């Protein structure tokens, strides 16, 4: 099964002290090839930015650098 390893940056939902202060959350996620476009739309709708997309072959969790 073809998998994409998507690294994205999303602003956090909680406000800290002031409205101007934002916390960003970086995460890496394995996404099946078929669902990759839907995942991209979800990240963009949350106001996030996709940093990197790589092709991770094989089974989920294999050869993807995720612990």
Curated annotation (Swiss-Prot):
UniProt keyword terms in alphabetical order: Antenna complex, Membrane, Photosynthesis, Phycobilisome, Thylakoid
Membrane topology of this protein: Peripheral membrane protein
Residue intervals of the CpcD-like domain: 1-56
Statement: the UniProt record of this protein carries the keyword Glycoprotein: no
Coiled coil: none
Major subcellular location class: membrane
Localization per record: Cellular thylakoid membrane
GO process terms (BP): photosynthesis
Domain of life where this protein originates: Bacteria
Pfam annotation, one family: CpcD
Entry-linked SMART domains: CpcD
GO cellular component: phycobilisome; plasma membrane-derived thylakoid membrane
Function: Rod linker protein, associated with allophycocyanin. Linker polypeptides determine the state of aggregation and the location of the disk-shaped phycobiliprotein units within the phycobilisome and modulate their spectroscopic properties in order to mediate a directed and optimal energy transfer.
Family: Belongs to the phycobilisome linker protein family.
Annotated protein name in UniProt: Phycobilisome 7.8 kDa linker polypeptide, allophycocyanin-associated, core
Species of the source: Synechocystis sp. (strain ATCC 27184 / PCC 6803 / Kazusa)
Lineage of the organism: Bacteria, Bacillati, Cyanobacteriota, Cyanophyceae, Synechococcales
Gene name linked to the record: apcC
């Amino acid at each position: 099964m073809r998998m994409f390893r998507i690294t994205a940056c999303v602003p956090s939902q909680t406000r800290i002290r002031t409205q101007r202060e934002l916390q960003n959350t970086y995460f890496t996620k394995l996404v099946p090839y078929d669902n990759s476009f839907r995942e991209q739309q979800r990240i963009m709708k949350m106001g996030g930015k996709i940093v990197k997309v790589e092709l991770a072959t094989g089974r989920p969790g294999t050869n993807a650098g995720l612990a």
